[in-house]
Amino acid sequence: IADEWEHSTNERRMFRVIASLYAQLDLGEIYKPLKGLRYRLNFGPDFRYRRNGTFRDKESTSSQGQNHASNANNSNVSWTLDNLIYYNREFGQHSLGLTLLESATKYRKENASLAANGIPYEPSMWNALDKSQISQLADWSTDLVERQLLSYMVRLNYGFADKYLLTVSGRWDGASQLAEGHKWAFFPSAALGWNINQEDFLKDVNWISQLKLRRNAFGSDPSSRNPKTF
């Protein structure tokens, strides 16, 4: 029985670059009437490349008397870009917070693989899969997956005396993987909060540091559906 370890080679390589970048601008520091207004930019790129090369010489029990080689390449590129505007102010016992968001996400994955028999020059292994040099093309495939998501969001927070809280938001999501005519959807949400520990009848109760009652109502996000495959 031939030793397969001596007659086969498998090499995998991977390269990845991932980052999280942001920039922020306090407009109130530049122009006093805009106190409480801030702008923030978030950018998160992610790049991955993988290559898997396999070679089995003609002495391998699975090569059927021919040198066999395969080469598979995979690249993934994705990024997310967020534009955010914040506005926060207090007026006496009233507090107001406004958040505006525009977010774009893109994902792209490409796959390509090739396998052949009859490699004439063994040291080249999977690096010379030229149709003029090989005797038989055994297998090949290509694949492309893409998806995009674009979102807009508005959120309003209101508080009174640090006791009673209201949050109202609306989000518009557009997803490329959804069917034509159904790519965009609106998702509203609302929440009421009550900081009970701030009430006079609990202020002297030392063993309660925080007690909050919250009620939410919100929609769902369909953008997690399968991406489009070409």
State the predicted function of each range.
Residues 4-10, 64-72, 138-142, 173-179:
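Extracellular loop and loop/strand-boundary signature of outer-membrane beta-barrel proteins
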Residues 19-27, 81-87, 100, 154-158, ...:
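Residues on the lipid-exposed face of transmembrane beta-strands in outer-membrane beta-barrel proteins
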Residues 1-28, 131-155, 159-161, 165-169:
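Outer-membrane beta-barrel transmembrane strand signature
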Residues 21, 39-43, 98-100, 168, ...:
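Membrane-embedded beta-strand positions of outer-membrane beta-barrel proteins
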Residues 13-19, 77-81, 148-152, 182-188, ...:
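Residues that define the transmembrane beta-barrel architecture of outer-membrane proteins
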Residues 43-51, 102-108, 141, 170-176, ...:
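Transmembrane beta-strands of outer-membrane beta-barrel pores
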Residues 28-37, 90-96, 163, 197-211:
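Short loop/turn motifs that connect adjacent beta-strands in outer-membrane beta-barrel proteins
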Residues 1-3, 54-69, 110-139, 229-230:
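Surface-exposed loop/turn segments flanking beta-strands in extracellular/periplasmic regions
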